[in-house]
Amino acid sequence: LTKKDYFKMIEMKTGALFAAACQLSAIISNTPKTVSDAMFEYGMKLGTAYQIYDDVVDLVGSEDQIGKTLGTDLEKGKLTLPILNLLERANPKQKEILSKRIIEHKPLDLPILVGIAEYEGSMSDAIDTAANFVSDARNALKLLKASESTEALRNITFFVDQLLEGCR
């Protein structure tokens, strides 16, 4: 899986879900096309950011806090942005070992893997990428007139920013 494929996949998954919800709310409200397009862009960017956050939390979150077992994506052989970043940075031997274990669904020592990913900057790069998507979502709102609704949408982006910062 390449990063390009990863981004396409999460845009078609979570990004599209958020985008549809946001754009449909604008369409139902009989807003101009520019507004519904801005809402689509907002939802797509926010949903993509949220999926990256979810992928990061799957590695570094607290099971009590997130209510699910950590490392489930890795157990299923799913490559997420933090792991793709790590594979990019790994030397050929590390890359071979990690890839083989993921493909064969062999257990990985999650704390050690996360430590390596943090040391190599893979986690912070994934968080930074998600933060950029959040910023893009916030920028999409600039096309909307100021209102309580627009401010509520903007506040959602700040909430996601806080979630991301909590992963650092």
Where are these regions (language model features)?
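All-alpha prenyltransferase/terpene-synthase fold signal
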Residues: 1-168
